[in-house]
Amino acid sequence: MSTPHINAPLDAFADTILMPGDPLRAKLIAETYLENVVQVTDVRGMLGFTGEFKGRKISVMGHGMGAPSASIYFHELMTTYKVKNFIRIGSCGAIHDDVKLKDLIVAIGASTDSKMNRIRFKDNDFAATANYNMLSECVNTLKTTDINYLVGNVFSSDLFYRPDEEQYDMMARYGILGVEMEVNALYSAAAENHCNAVALCTVTDHIKNHEHLTADERRTELHEMINVALDVALKLPTE
């Protein structure tokens, strides 16, 4: 049985999945890091794969850009395919002066300007947060590396190009470390469906300072984040 957006058999996915936004990055991760890889879905070009990492079955799949797109895949993976552990691996833009290019943010929670949670949570504000055990594993793993990391809140925006950039100053005052587009949707879907989720975001741009990583720098830093995510996946309990 498949879903409208995933054409995979029910047993196609592992209990733990890594999810970048870009389906081609999912393909790169699968082909670079996993063994015995099988492509399990390709509807609308949103590629998904399952393979093995150091003997553990792990899946990787893209989720697209923005909360509406990502929420479709989160929901179908959680409800139909019974995936339990979600690790988002993505990029973000920094807005806080203490956050630098190449920093890795472990997202405790995610504020948002999206109305999706107002619909989901009966017009109330839902505090979308990571699973504590997964968050702890991320921090413990990062402590063994040379990666400069921060743990705190991010902001999930429906707009990539905002017309009101002065809002970034307000977000920084509240301690928001970075801006991206999907973490709030992931944490909310995980809470709704009793799943576990954590998000890792590499700082590839500094919105306030107008600094950006080069293409080569992005590739290197994202690979470091992927290694962390895979190490965390190995430490999670199996179903």
From Swiss-Prot:
Protein name: Purine nucleoside phosphorylase DeoD-type
Single GO cellular component term: cytosol
Keywords of this entry: Glycosyltransferase, Transferase
Family: Belongs to the PNP/UDP phosphorylase family.
Organism: Aliivibrio fischeri (strain ATCC 700601 / ES114) (Vibrio fischeri)
One GO-annotated biological process of the protein: purine nucleoside catabolic process
Reaction catalysed by this enzyme: a purine D-ribonucleoside + phosphate = a purine nucleobase + alpha-D-ribose 1-phosphate; a purine 2'-deoxy-D-ribonucleoside + phosphate = a purine nucleobase + 2-deoxy-alpha-D-ribose 1-phosphate
NCBIfam families (alphabetical): deoD, PRK05819.1, PRK13374.1
Pfam families cross-referenced by the UniProt entry: PNP_UDP_1
